[in-house]
Amino acid sequence: MIKKLLPLLVLSTISATTVAATPPNTLVVAQGLDDIVSLDPAEANELSSIQTVPSLYQRVVQPDRNDPTKITPILAESWQADPAAKTLTIKLKSDAKFASGNPVRPEDVIYSYVRAVTLNKSGAFILNVLGWQPENIASQLKKIDDHTVQVQWSADVSPALALNILSTPIASIVDEKLVAPNAKNNDFGNEWLKMHSAGSGAFKMRTYQPHQAIVMEANASSPTGAPKLKSVIIKNVPDPATRRLLIQQGDADMARDLGADQIDALQGKPGVKVMSIASAEQNYLAFNTGNKDNPLMSNPAFWEAA
């Protein structure tokens, strides 16, 4: 596995965002939503869901907005790493609350990691890098006190990589007290969370109509502070040309994932701003170690060099 953070200069991997005039207190976003399978952070693994989940949920740590190569505390107040023991002892912010008003507890962190690994949806491979599997995950997590949780891993990875993994959307912390009562058939509330939210993010779900729209409203109690907007409406607009037209007409404030031709057509238009935003990524390389014709593939030194 290679951990890579994409810089701004890698233009082919950076999405452009176009912003026009915004109606008071409401942001209207035009983008495609047809790829969404679920908005449960333990299952969300498509572009549109990954773009939405961080508005609804937070992690103990997250990439810094201005420099994605750095990790910043969000629900965590501080942490201590023990490379030899392969542990992170994380102290949570004592005043952190979910949108429900419930406090963020070590139990919520443990529940969130256990459910993500046990559900074993498509994004679980990220947490598997730590050596976490359904059969061992419970033994890797421990409540130390009312505001402290210890995270352990069995894989041969550094605390720095462990923190980066815990900053990804699948490591989002959900409100156990809200989710657990909505569980059915041992699904950890997965079916319920496809249409609802239970996080501490800047916004909370008001309504989600698959293939139509997502409506989020401000979470005034978010640990990172209340957002400036009262609501966000994300409309499903599959066609990039239509997204561009909505921007030009002032019917949308933001359009995501426009093609190069759409961006070129908007460059220099009055009242329109094109933005390129860097983001953190993890890239994985797979080597065919069974290839007898190429012994390099089974050489660990080659893996590291690649």
Sequence positions of predicted segments:
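Alpha-helical secondary-structure segments
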Residues: 28, 105-112, 146-152, 201-202, ...
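N-terminal lobe/hinge region of extracytoplasmic solute-binding protein
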Residues: 30-83, 114, 121, 198-200
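A structural "hinge/loop" feature
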Residues: 34-50, 72-75, 102, 156-172, ...
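Aromatic- and charge-enriched surface segment that lines or borders ligand/interaction sites
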Residues: 77-123, 150, 246, 296, ...
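Surface-exposed binding/hinge segments that line
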Residues: 91, 129-181
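Gly/Pro-rich hinge or "lid" segments in bacterial periplasmic/extracellular proteins
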Residues: 167-227, 231
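Ligand-site clamp/hinge motif
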Residues: 191, 219-265
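Ligand-binding "clamshell"
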Residues: 264-276
